[in-house]
Amino acid sequence: MAFRASGPAYQPLAPAASPARARVPAVAWIGVGAIVGAFALVAALVLVPPRSSWGLSPCDSGWQEFNAGCVAWDPTPVEHEQAVGGCSAPATLIPRAAAKHLAALTRVQAERSSGYWWVNGDGIRTCLRLVDSVSGIDEFCEELAIRICYYPRSPGGFVRFVTSIRNALGLP
């Protein structure tokens, strides 16, 4: 038996891959690596810092923290127009619900038999009577009342995202 040397010794099963096809998996791996890297970065941002670093920003100088907001006041009673214009932006007169809560916390009902606070009434002359925490408008209010300025503090969207993930994972 003679061997034939005239042709290839084997037949390929599939045609050779083109160079363009060989690069597609490399691009896919780079994309997957970028996604995994971004996920690891977000996970590190969520898990590594303590919860206290994701809290609300502190109140400005001269303001007191009150729940999720900041308050400042002057104990001198003023007229409504002066009270409305006396709060520096972004602050406004304290909202009615926050004023009732502040009155209950400071127990001003026990200390005073009369007195009023101006509250935010969206342009309407609105006040809160301290003795019983009843709010009213116009004639219900006295001419002079105490101005309490208030501005809310709220965390940004990413902070809410981080705290919700930490809560879901049961992290302190």
From Swiss-Prot:
The keyword Transmembrane helix applies. The chain crosses the membrane at residues 28-48. It is a single-pass type II membrane protein. Residues 49-172 are virion surface. It comes from the Viruses. It is found in: Virion membrane. One of its GO terms (cellular component) is membrane. Residues 1-27 are intravirion. InterPro entries: Herpes_UL45 (IPR018002). It holds the Pfam family UL45. Keywords: Membrane, Signal-anchor, Transmembrane, Transmembrane helix, Viral envelope protein, Virion. Belongs to the herpesviridae HHV-1 UL45 family. Important virulence factor of HSV neurotropism. Seems to be required for glycoprotein B-induced fusion. Dispensable for growth in vitro. This is Envelope protein UL45. It comes from Human herpesvirus 2 (strain 333) (HHV-2).
